[in-house]
Structure formats: C-alpha cells, structure tokens
Design a protein with these regions (language model features):
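Non-heme Fe(II)/2-oxoglutarate
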Residues: 2-11, 17-119
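Short conserved micro-motifs at the rims of enzyme active sites and ligand-binding pockets
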Residues: 45, 213-214
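Catalytic core of non-heme Fe(II) oxygenases with the double-stranded beta-helix
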Residues: 100-210, 217-232
Length: 232
C-alpha cells in the first residue's frame, strides 16, 4: 500500500462499517478497545507505510521523572509524580513541516479529514462532536511508555468538561505487549493489551490511565494515530 484510502470507510472491516451505522458506542463506559474494526491486511500495510514515510520525521518526546520528586520531599507519603513519557511524536496539525508533508504524501491527512472519520468518531462517542479536531501521530519503540495522567484540561473552556479521543493502533511483528492500565471505581485496576494490529480505542476523557513500556524485539514499534474531538 502506497497511500491510505481517501475515505476512512474504505479502511474499515465489515464490523467497522457497522459502527458507522450506529451499532457500537461507548455509552456509559469511559473506554473501549476493539481489534476487529479495521481490515487486517490494511492495518498491516498501514504500519509499513508509516514506518517508511513518517518514521524518519517523528521527533523524540522525553519527560523523565524529575529528581526533585524525591530530593525535595520532606514528609512521608508526600509523593507527587508529574506526567512522564518517552515516545516519538508528530503534530499533524502543524501548518508546515516534514510530518505534515509526510501525512499529505501518504494520504493520511486526506483520510483523517474524510467525513466518515468524523462520523466514525461521533458514532463511538455517542454524542455530537465539534467539526474541527486535533490530529497527532505517536511512535512507541522498545521501552517507550506514557506515565499516569488524566488528560484533564480545566483551563481549556472547550475541554474542561471532558472530550473524546479516537486512537488507531498499528503494530509491527516485533512487538509482543503494551498494556493500557486505567481506573475503575477509583483504582488503577483495568488493563487491556494495546499492542494489537489495527486496534481501535475510544476514550471519554478525563480519567486516570497510563501505558506500560512497549515489550518485544529491538525492532518493536507501535504507531498511534490520534484524533481529539470536543463535544458540541
């Protein structure tokens, strides 16, 4: 595959197309993950295309645990952990740059802007979404992770009461496992393996969650294409 399909609907499996018909939604749950909504052959081809074209232009994002989180602690059980992360990323909304050029060259931008992509997100969210949305690409390599965080943005008027994320996951054969751990009933007790080719994940944010280090061979990689939508 040299290009993503122009219409996101053409990227979907029969089960994925049923989402467009309103057959699947988050309802009351904050999180949903399904491995059967993208056609398997297209998911495999998408990984190879992203590695070849977008792989050389993603940039490292590295936020380690600050030493002050221990050195400045003066009381027992006073731990405070800011969001930590190690991944490679590209802002697909940037007005210019190599990542935006790659997204255009591969047809990824056209597919994400197709009406069926937004319709798919709206169907999963189970409520109306604003027309505009954010787009981002992440590439996890061996040991890359995202630490505990909520994705709560109380200073953003459009997001302070919650918003919706749609994630498309494309995984190479060298990856064996990466868990998403998320909170239920006040505890980080729920897990799902997200190192699954073609996995579609839907998030009604904010809630506590984190992603464990990607496991596998030295060649392991997992791509994540994100769409971030505000509720209308």
């Amino acid at each position: 595959m040299d290009r993503f399909p122009a219409d996101f609907a053409d990227f979907l499996s029969p089960a994925g197309r049923r989402v467009l018909d309103g057959k699947l939604t988050l309802r009351a749950e904050p999180f949903l993950a399904r491995p059967d909504l993208i056609a398997p052959a297209k998911a495999k081809a998408a990984f190879a295309l992203l590695e070849r074209v977008l792989g050389p232009v993603v940039k490292p994002l590295d936020r380690a645990i600050p030493p002050e989180s221990i050195l400045n602690q003066t009381r027992n059980y006073q731990e405070r952990l800011p969001k930590t992360v190690r991944v490679r990323t590209a802002d697909l909304d940037a007005s210019r740059g190599k990542a935006r050029d790659a997204a255009r060259a591969t047809g990824l931008e056209t597919m994400l802007l197709s009406p069926s992509f937004r319709d798919f997100a709206t169907a999963l969210a189970g409520r109306k979404l604003t027309r505009g949305f954010g787009r981002q690409a992440l590439r996890y390599g061996p040991g890359d992770y995202s630490g505990p965080h909520t994705d709560h943005h109380p200073e953003d008027p459009a997001a302070k009461d919650g918003y919706f994320d749609l994630h498309l996951s494309f995984v190479g054969g060298g990856a064996t496992r990466q868990l998403l751990v998320y909170a239920k009933d006040g505890h980080l007790s729920e897990t799902v393996d997200v190192a699954v080719p073609g996995l579609v994940s839907a998030y009604r944010l904010p809630f506590w969650h984190y992603t464990t280090p990607l496991e596998g061979k030295a060649s392991a990689a997992r791509w994540l294409i994100l769409g971030t939508f505000y509720f209308a």
